[in-house]
Amino acid sequence: MPKYRSATTTHGRNMAGARALWRATGMTDADFGKPIIAVVNSFTQFVPGHVHLRDLGKLVAEQIEAAGGVAKEFNTIAVDDGIAMGHGGMLYSLPSRELIADSVEYMVNAHCADAMVCISNCDKITPGMLMASLRLNIPVIFVSGGPMEAGKTKLSDQIIKLDLVDAMIQGADPKVSDSQSAQVERSACPTCGSCSGMFTANSMNCLTEALGLSQPGNGSLLATHADRKQLFLNAGKRIVELTKRYYEQDDESALPRNIASKAAFENAMTLDIAMGGSTNTVLHLLAAAQEAEIDFTMSDIDKLSRKVPQLCKVAPSTQKYHMEDVHRAGGVIGILGELDRAGLLNRDVKNVLGLTLPQTLEQYDIVVTQDDAVKNMFRAGPAGIRTTQAFSQDCRWDTLDDDRSNGCIRSLEHAYSKDGGLAVLYGNFAENGCIVKTAGVDDSILKFTGPAKVYESQDDAVEAILGGKVVAGDVVVIRYEGPKGGPGMQEMLYPTSFLKSMGLGKACALITDGRFSGGTSGLSIGHVSPEAASGGSIGLIEDGDLIAIDIPNRGIQLQVSDAELAARREAQEARGDKAWTPKKRERQVSFALRAYASLATSADKGAVRDKSKLGG
């Protein structure tokens, strides 16, 4: 029988000092036999996805206390990728994932907490907390802040839905008037919550459902809707049950590594491919799997991508649907239901509610459930009122979207595409693979060949695109922007958005060892591995080289002979200390970022730290 971790600090005369300090936080004699549960919050006023979380930790804590536990809240940092985008701030985004994971480990282990409720939401916060949860392997439940309502505005006498990416594209389009650009900017992000499309934050919060670590509805129920409050109340109650099951009944099925098993990781990636999730999820699932000591690699993702169809299409891949529409169609469980009926899921998995996948689908899939309360929850919709307050409205759709032929979520027979929304490509400068969000690629450019235009920083590429130096047919190559080379593996949302604003969204390709925002669409290929800074062949590409992209056959090829590439590699190595570095780039890199770069691995490893360099 495992002993409560917290007993280390609450039992025995030699812990009198620790108990004295616990008393100063409000604990009493009656609390010293109870489980201590960390409420891991991520409230900040910097990020719309987190601005409403201030009081939600208290909400969870009250339920923990009522259920017989002791709740202790602490906060992590949270970087807003959209605000950090397009300048030096983006260098810090991916490294913040490791800091978040480490900070959770530090707090939980330093104070011997028994379990956690993780209140996350945006791009690196959910992955960081997920990595920490699987590293620590103590009972955990995730409950995120929820998606933002889609923006709406009237253009050309038509009401259209908007999000952050629309504001960026309009702002950079010289053909758009100042007044229209300002109108879109003011309408794009109307409420608190994670940006309204299937971007990285919402993708990851959906994946926690498929991993079994959060409750049904977590990924899609709007931040502003009153129904979302119940997820927080349930999390507080349920975590005490899970904790007691493990520590008092020796039930290891309550632990995250036994819930988020390899089978669950395969289900999560299957969901990701089917819903056309952000390419960043590949990085984060690979990183989380390593923390869980699960053998889940790019090879597994490649195999899944070849057999899983695209059953859901959401912004940025279409303007028609946003997360509020996914929820109305049954949310994550709705997609999982269709995947299960297609025979594409591992069924022998459980979630934090203790339900198997078939039990979860029976109760929560709107196509089959007889539970009116569940159907009512999935009718939760937007209010269209600007707010930063959680649970501030209770509007409902008149009907559910259960049309699996033409609705937001489709059945296998009516899939948007027989190929899934993500694909792994391999070739002579991506020997370890690269990732493309096929959900956002127009059919006309699934096969594309063009001359390379090579840039050694995102800034240079942006300048060239806006300066008209990139033309239809070009393949833009941005290198030395990987985890080590950036450092920090910047997102390339500005270059892809500016290609669209210049009318080149369906006429050019962009390839990088960096990564893309979940808001990216178009022929955007990232995570090229190995990265240039690690000696990857992307560092050997020269202006004018022809690059052939073949998504249907999962290929990407630099049309240069092996002999020529060998000669270029020899010349690169001859640069000595300057080898595999940009020839010219002005960039201030802090000590903190250099420390991150010194341990960073390429994207095919999840951009995690190289433990071998530390002897572990």
Swiss-Prot record:
InterPro entries given in the database record: Dihydro-acid_dehy_C, DihydroxyA_deHydtase, DiOHA_6PGluconate_deHydtase_CS, ILV_EDD_C, ILV_EDD_N, IlvD/EDD_N
Active site: 517
Cofactor dependence: [2Fe-2S] cluster; Mg(2+)
Residues that coordinate or bind Mg(2+): 81, 123-124, 491
Record bears the keyword Endoplasmic reticulum: no
One annotated Gene Ontology cellular component of this protein: cytosol
Residue positions, PTM N6-carboxylysine: 124
Any single GO BP term: L-valine biosynthetic process
Cofactor binding, per record: Binds 1 [2Fe-2S] cluster per subunit. This cluster acts as a Lewis acid cofactor.
Positions with a binding annotation for [2Fe-2S] cluster: 122, 195
Enzyme Commission numbers on file: 4.2.1.9
Catalytic activity: (2R)-2,3-dihydroxy-3-methylbutanoate = 3-methyl-2-oxobutanoate + H2O; (2R,3R)-2,3-dihydroxy-3-methylpentanoate = (S)-3-methyl-2-oxopentanoate + H2O
Family annotation (HAMAP family): IlvD (MF_00012)
Similarity field: Belongs to the IlvD/Edd family.
Main function: Functions in the biosynthesis of branched-chain amino acids. Catalyzes the dehydration of (2R,3R)-2,3-dihydroxy-3-methylpentanoate (2,3-dihydroxy-3-methylvalerate) into 2-oxo-3-methylpentanoate (2-oxo-3-methylvalerate) and of (2R)-2,3-dihydroxy-3-methylbutanoate (2,3-dihydroxyisovalerate) into 2-oxo-3-methylbutanoate (2-oxoisovalerate), the penultimate precursor to L-isoleucine and L-valine, respectively.
Record's subunit section: Homodimer.
Protein name: Dihydroxy-acid dehydratase
Source organism: Escherichia coli O6:H1 (strain CFT073 / ATCC 700928 / UPEC)
